[in-house]
């Protein structure tokens, strides 16, 4: 049986207040910052060999929605070929993400996986913040297809490859 190992761990400071220094920091930007640091710490691991990004998030909505694992991986500079998945298991979402990543490695399906958790309560506090901060402006400008719904993606694929209905 293959063995899964944790190569490193990084965490951000804990934001304790709606008036604190991190209260307006987007969770996808914060997670991307952590991922960039992990990449910098381990230059011997080529980012092209990362098989997946698995991130737990108890409230995957608003600024934390739209597959924060995938969005953060793009912001961190991982190749567009690296998929991402967001897992919601409420308080144990981050632990579940690490377990899922380990299982993927142990089963032989993948070799290198980013795994962890992200949460920012200040960005999901009320309905206006959920909608006001939903789309990351950097991602919208540089990777707009990340926000496409499946129907739009299907239309692009159908047109690109001449697939009839």
Model-predicted segments: where are they?
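Short glycine-rich phosphate-binding loop at a beta-alpha junction
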Residues: 49-56, 114
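A glycine-/small-polar-enriched, mobile loop at the entrance of the PLP active site in fold-type I
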Residues: 55-63
């Amino acid at each position: 049986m293959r063995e899964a190992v944790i190569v490193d761990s990084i965490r951000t400071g804990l934001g304790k207040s709606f008036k604190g220094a991190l209260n307006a920091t987007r969770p996808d930007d914060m997670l991307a910052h952590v991922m960039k640091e992990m990449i910098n710490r381990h230059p011997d691991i080529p980012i092209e060999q990362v098989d997946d990004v698995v991130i737990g998030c108890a409230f995957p909505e608003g600024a934390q929605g739209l597959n924060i694992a995938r969005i953060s991986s793009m912001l961190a500079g991982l190749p567009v070929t690296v998929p991402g998945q967001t897992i919601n298991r409420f308080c144990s979402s981050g632990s579940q993400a690490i377990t899922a990543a380990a299982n993927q490695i142990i089963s032989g399906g993948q070799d290198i996986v980013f795994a962890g958790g992200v949460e920012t309560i200040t960005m999901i506090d009320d309905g206006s913040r959920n909608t006001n901060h939903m789309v990351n402006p950097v991602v919208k400008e540089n990777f707009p297809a990340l926000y496409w719904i499946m129907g739009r993606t299907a239309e692009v694929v159908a047109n690109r490859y001449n697939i009839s209905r």
